[in-house]
Amino acid sequence: MPAKLSVNLNAVAMLRNRRDLPWPSVTGLGRAALAAGAAGLTVHPRPDQRHIRFSDLGDIRALIDDEFPQAEFNIEGFPSEAFLDLVEKHQPEQVTLVPDDPTQATSDHGWDFVSRSDFLAPIVARLKAGGMRVSLFADPDPLGYERAAAIGVDRVELYTGPYGATYDDPAAATRELDRLEKAANAATALGLDINAGHDLTVDNLPALVKRIPQLSEVSIGHGLTADALMYGMPVTVSRYIAALA
């Protein structure tokens, strides 16, 4: 079964926030993505609300519940108490925990599972008790994956930024794919499902899914939004789904 596509709406929200105006509509483009076949929507609300606003979360939850009940809502973020309160309020199907500093422009590394498993364990338990699937952002290095499995995580999301950066270097792309494949196989052996995200595009997805056929989901924002400016959201989503096939 092909990996599912979750459309990250942060870039849409960032464009909206350049003006004190309600467009482009985050929920409007989310609706277009889901209508075109996306399996879910992803957001990463940061404390300063520089792209996704806290008020967007209820709107997206309502959009999915009212119009696309088969779709999933994925909320990413560092597990501060404020973040945990947000996800417990809006009940996404999946919570993806990332080790970001709040001032970071974007997620650029995974968790150190060896040193942070004691911090993460009660958070994972709390979210799972609330009925949410939990994924942890992970570097493509299997060191410590057994710690992630031991604390009850459902999935790891492989950080694909270094792979995305090899768009003009085929040899480097092959090396990064080797790392990702090895990491994915190690996670699968531990009973973890695999997500992936960061700098994925129509061009680099086919090689990734060929190497990791067990991939459950990709969340894509920047590249997909850039393509949507050229082709429109419905056509763009269709192209990404085809790239995952």
Curated annotation (Swiss-Prot):
Residues bound to 3-amino-2-oxopropyl phosphate are 8, 19, 199, 221-222
Q: Which UniProt keywords apply?
A: Cytoplasm, Pyridoxine biosynthesis, Transferase
- Origin, by domain of life? Bacteria
Residue positions binding 1-deoxy-D-xylulose 5-phosphate: 46, 51, 106
Q: What class of enzyme is it?
A: transferase
Q: Where in the cell is it found?
A: Cytoplasm
Give the Pfam families listed for this entry.
Answer: PdxJ
Q: Which reaction does it catalyse?
A: 3-amino-2-oxopropyl phosphate + 1-deoxy-D-xylulose 5-phosphate = pyridoxine 5'-phosphate + phosphate + 2 H2O + H(+)
**Gene Ontology biological process terms in this record:** pyridoxine biosynthetic process
GO molecular function annotations of the record: pyridoxine 5'-phosphate synthase activity
Residues carrying the site annotation Transition state stabilizer: 157
Q: Where is the active site?
A: 44 (proton acceptor), 76 (proton acceptor), 198 (proton donor)
Entry's EC annotation: 2.6.99.2
The record's section on Gene3D superfamilies has: Aldolase class I (3.20.20.70)
Chief subcellular location? cytoplasm
Claim: Transferase is one of the keywords in the record: yes
Q: Which SUPFAM superfamilies match?
A: Pyridoxine 5'-phosphate synthase (SSF63892)
Q: Which GO terms describe its cellular component?
A: cytosol
Q: In which pathway does it act?
A: Cofactor biosynthesis; pyridoxine 5'-phosphate biosynthesis; pyridoxine 5'-phosphate from D-erythrose 4-phosphate: step 5/5
In terms of CDD domains, this protein maps to: PNPsynthase (cd00003)
Q: Which NCBIfam families does this UniProt record tie to the protein?
A: pdxJ, PRK05265.1-4
**Hey, which family's this protein in?**
Belongs to the PNP synthase family.
Assembly behavior: Homooctamer; tetramer of dimers.
What function does this protein fulfil? Catalyzes the complicated ring closure reaction between the two acyclic compounds 1-deoxy-D-xylulose-5-phosphate (DXP) and 3-amino-2-oxopropyl phosphate (1-amino-acetone-3-phosphate or AAP) to form pyridoxine 5'-phosphate (PNP) and inorganic phosphate.
Q: Mind telling me which HAMAP family this protein's record contains?
A: PdxJ
Kindly provide the name given to this protein in its UniProt entry.
Answer: Pyridoxine 5'-phosphate synthase
- Gene that encodes it: pdxJ
